[in-house]
C-alpha cells in the first residue's frame, strides 16, 4: 500500500506523534527486547518476511529494508541497523547498485531527479529539489541519480534530456517531467503526481 501525500494517509504520515515506545523517552525509536505492541517498534526485514501493517522504507545510509508503522513516519524514525534517520530532509544519492533497492522495495513513493554535474539547469534546480525534499518527506522519498555514472539505469528509463524527474510508486513509474522547475512548481507537480496514482 503506497503512502499518498494528498490523501487520507497524508495526515497519518505527516503528523508528529508525541509519545514514544515504552522505556525510550524522547530518544530515537529502537526495537525492544520484549514483545512489542503493534505499531511501536521498527524492524529490519529480509527477503520474504512479512511487513504486516508497516511501510517498507529503504535506509538511505545502509540500504537496509526497514518496516515503519504508517502513523510513525512523521516521528523521525531511525534505522535499527545503522541508527541514522530514515528521513533527513536531503535527497538520497542513488547509483546503479542501489537504485532498484530504493525504488522497487519502498512502499513510500520515490521521486528521482535524473541529472548530470555538467548540466546547468540540473545545478540550478538542485536547491529547489532539496527544499521540496525537506518539506515533503516522509510523504515521499527524494533521490538523485547521476546519469553520467549510472548510464544503464538512465537508458532503462529512456532518459533523453536532463533534468528529468520520475515519480515511482510500488516500483513502477507513475509520472515523468523533463526540465527544471522552481520549488513551488516542483512541489505542485509532485503533490499532483502522488494524488493521481
Placement of each model-derived feature along the sequence:
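Short linker/helix segments within small regulatory modules
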Residues: 68-77
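Short pre-active-site segment immediately N-terminal to redox-active cysteine/selenocysteine motifs
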Residues: 107, 114-118, 161
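Short cysteine-rich clusters marking metal-coordination/redox-active sites
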Residues: 59-62, 79-82
Amino acid at each position: 500500500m503506497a503512502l499518498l501525500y494528498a490523501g487520507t494517509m497524508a495526515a497519518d504520515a505527516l503528523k508528529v506523534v508525541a509519545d514514544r515506545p515504552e522505556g525510550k523517552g524522547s530518544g530515537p525509536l529502537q526495537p525492544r527486547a520484549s514483545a512489542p505492541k503493534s505499531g511501536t517498534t521498527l524492524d529490519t526485514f529480509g527477503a520474504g518476511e512479512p511487513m504486516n501493517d508497516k511501510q517498507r522504507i529503504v535506509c538511505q545510509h545502509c540500504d537496509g529494508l526497514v518496516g515503519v508503522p504508517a502513523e510513525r513516519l512523521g516521528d523521525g524514525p531511525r534505522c535499527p541497523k545503522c541508527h541514522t534517520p530514515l528521513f533527513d530532509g536531503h535527497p538520497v544519492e542513488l547509483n546503479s547498485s542501489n537504485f532498484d533497492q530504493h525504488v522497487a522495495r519502498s512502499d513510500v513513493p520515490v521521486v528521482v531527479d535524473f541529472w548530470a554535474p555538467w548540466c546547468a539547469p540540473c545545478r540550478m534546480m538542485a536547491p529547489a529539489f532539496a527544499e521540496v525534499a525537506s518539506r515533503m518527506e516522509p510523504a515521499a522519498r527524494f533521490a538523485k541519480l547521476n546519469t553520467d555514472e549510472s548510464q544503464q539505469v538512465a537508458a532503462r528509463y529512456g532518459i533523453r534530456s536532463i533534468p528529468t524527474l520520475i515519480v515511482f510508486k510500488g516500483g513502477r513509474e507513475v509520472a515523468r517531467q523533463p526540465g527544471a522547475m522552481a520549488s513551488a512548481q516542483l512541489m505542485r507537480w509532485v503533490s499532483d503526481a502522488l494524488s493521481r496514482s
